Amino acid sequence: MASVRDDEFLRLAAASGCKAFFVGLESVSQASLNGTHKGHNRVGDYRQLLERFHAHGIALQAGILFGFDEDDQDIFARTVDGMGDIGLDNATISLMVPYPGTPAFAKLSAEHRIIDFDWRHYNGKTHVVYRPKKMSPDELMAGYEWAKTQFYSPRQIVKRLAISRTGLWWNVPRNLGYMFGLTSEMRARAAMHRVEKDEPSFGVVERIDQSQGIEGNKGTEGNIGIEGIR
């Protein structure tokens, strides 16, 4: 992928009709990024990165993950405030997932921190499948839910887009779509939990051999971000 630091690349992208980029920023914690070998993402450069996109009329959708070993309970408010302060247009917010076959899964398995072997739950949205290091699974889930609803709250939408001012005619409806979509997501999750109570054995993985994992899923970590945004 061409570097997002290349202004000529961004100029050509905008001229082609590109409206938005997805970039795996992953976290506002440099310690969390360094701990997962993603130190090429520099938190101190996020504002400049956004300004470069916005100068070309391109919005930025960031991938944000919660649940890294260096994340504590402050990470949720820090993320919402930090992304609001720099005018991030949108975010796809998820839970860190240690997919079988990755070093993340092997590490957590060796530390006896995998608590859920039901494959349906490895979706980054509905369940915490391991024990986080600096909070409980319930605290991680609650913080994740809070951060999503806060990021897409009317106050935060106004704050972020007042800074961005990029494609407001489509960026405002896009944010509102996410805001209203959270209600549907919560209903779907509640329905999923009800089904699981009725059919507890469906889809359960009895045991996953961490030394073999699952072929075709050999990433460096459970989730993959963009390379080189300095």
Regions found by a protein language model. Name each.
Residues 171-200:
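Short, amphipathic C-terminal "tail helix"
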Residues 1-169, 193-209, 230:
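A structural motif corresponding to the C-terminal lobe/cap of the Radical SAM core domain
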Residues 213-228:
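Small-residue-biased low-complexity repeat regions
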